Amino acid sequence: MAVPKRKTSPSKRGMRRSADALKAPTYIEDKNSGELRRPHHIDLKTGMYRGRSVLPPKD
């Protein structure tokens, strides 16, 4: 079994754990519909992605 040679300092432990926190999801306002959507995702209301129609729009 592997055993650490030195004690991990609180600073190093904190730096390792800094990526463990949950982050709130990011939303942006769509330019065309004004709806909130995730960046780099299809706008489900209009079916548009990067200026092109990908899905049929929802009514």
Curated annotation (Swiss-Prot):
Coiled-coil boundaries: none
GO cellular component terms, semicolon-separated: large ribosomal subunit
A Pfam family recorded for this sequence: Ribosomal_L32p
SUPFAM superfamilies linked to this entry: Zn-binding ribosomal proteins
Regions of compositional bias (Basic residues) in chain numbering: 1-16
Matching Gene3D superfamilies: Single helix bin
Amino acid composition bias (Basic and acidic residues), ranges on this chain: 28-44
An example Gene Ontology biological process: translation
UniProt-listed InterPro entries: Ribosomal_bL32 (IPR002677), Ribosomal_bL32_bact (IPR044957), Ribosomal_zn-bd (IPR011332)
GO MF, one annotated term: structural constituent of ribosome
Keywords: Ribonucleoprotein, Ribosomal protein
Positions of region (Disordered): 1-59
Similarity section: Belongs to the bacterial ribosomal protein bL32 family.
Name assigned to this protein: Large ribosomal subunit protein bL32
Source organism: Bartonella quintana (strain Toulouse) (Rochalimaea quintana)
Lineage of producing organism: Bacteria, Pseudomonadati, Pseudomonadota, Alphaproteobacteria, Hyphomicrobiales
Gene that produces this protein: rpmF
